């Protein structure tokens, strides 16, 4: 069994808000605060806003975990979130470690959510699943056989850049028709000319359909049966999103191993990003395990000798 999970300072960097919390070892928030993400400005001005937020945290944390949109280089601790143009190659991990005096780990926001869902949420006990954030942007985190899918840079699972509408809208990454360019809150606002929260039923259903299409592709590719989805767009649209999303999963995931894949709302609710950020710290510190390993098969008894 892993060691006891220590209290964590959790930091979530989003396109519309910056949030921080103290999270105990059972995933409960004992303090939290948030401020709007500055809409414009230089890298240092944005950092000053985040540093002031973190400085207000009460004492007690032993580790720090950070979730942020990608792309990023987790080995170097650098972030270049597409939804925060001011930060390109910004040394977020090291800045927070210096500001807090805590050992600090950094990961993609959707991968962080995947850890949180596996520890406390909709994926408890699951060995393989997909976690998604559908908010200002779209991100994904994948767990296979109890292990978070990762790579040297920390960018594995970028479901927001699956092509779901060939020849569609241009994405910030430079491609056309990416899920993020078609179904994120930023995309909805650009198309409708109003905040994503004001979108009508047809737009909400289309967002769900496109997310379901991407989920089905991942289910077919990786033999996954569950997708847990969080984020202000998905959770805010509710059944107007999840109904069409499930219908599209059912339509597109038809192989024997992917049929029946479910897409569900995150069980962590609005606290998911911060619980996920804390889980990043525990995972990095080696005190988090997503599920117990499968039991070893019993040894096969030798056949008795013949007469």
Model-derived features: positions:
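General beta-strand structural signal in soluble alpha/beta enzymes
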Residues: 104-108
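Short beta-strand segments
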Residues: 12, 65-69, 131-137, 141-143
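Adenylate-forming
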Residues: 113-119, 139-142, 162
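Residue-level detector of high-confidence beta-strand sites
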Residues: 32-34, 82, 115, 151
């Amino acid at each position: 069994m892993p060691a006891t999970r220590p209290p964590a300072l959790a930091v979530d960097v989003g396109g519309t808000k910056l949030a921080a919390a103290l999270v105990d070892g059972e995933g409960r928030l004992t303090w939290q605060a948030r401020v709007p993400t500055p809409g414009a400005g230089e890298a240092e001005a944005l950092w000053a806003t985040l540093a002031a937020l973190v400085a207000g945290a009460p004492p007690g944390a032993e580790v720090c975990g950070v979730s942020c949109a990608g792309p990023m280089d987790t080995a170097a601790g650098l972030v270049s979130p597409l939804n925060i143009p001011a930060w390109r190659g910004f040394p977020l991990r090291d800045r927070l470690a210096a500001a807090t005096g805590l050992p600090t780990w950094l990961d993609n926001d959707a991968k962080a959510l995947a850890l949180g869902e596996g520890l406390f949420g909709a994926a408890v006990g699951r060995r393989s699943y997909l976690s998604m954030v559908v908010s200002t942007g779209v991100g994904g985190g994948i767990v296979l056989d109890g292990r978070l899918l990762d790579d040297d840079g920390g960018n594995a699972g970028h479901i927001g850049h699956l092509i779901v509408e060939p020849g569609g809208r241009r994405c910030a990454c430079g491609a056309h028709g990416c899920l993020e360019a078609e179904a994120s809150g930023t995309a909805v606002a650009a198309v409708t000319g109003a905040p994503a929260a004001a979108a009508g039923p047809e737009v909400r259903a289309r967002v769900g359909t496109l997310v379901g299409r991407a989920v089905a592709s991942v289910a077919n590719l990786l033999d996954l049966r569950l997708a847990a989805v969080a984020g202000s767009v998905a959770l805010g649209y509710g059944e107007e999103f999840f109904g069409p999303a499930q219908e599209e999963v059912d339509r597109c995931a038809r192989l024997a191993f992917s049929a029946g894949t479910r897409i569900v709302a995150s069980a962590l609710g609005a606290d998911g990003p911060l619980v996920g950020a804390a889980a990043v710290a525990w995972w990095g510190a080696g005190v988090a395990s997503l599920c117990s390993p499968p039991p070893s098969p019993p040894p096969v008894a030798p056949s008795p000798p013949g007469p």
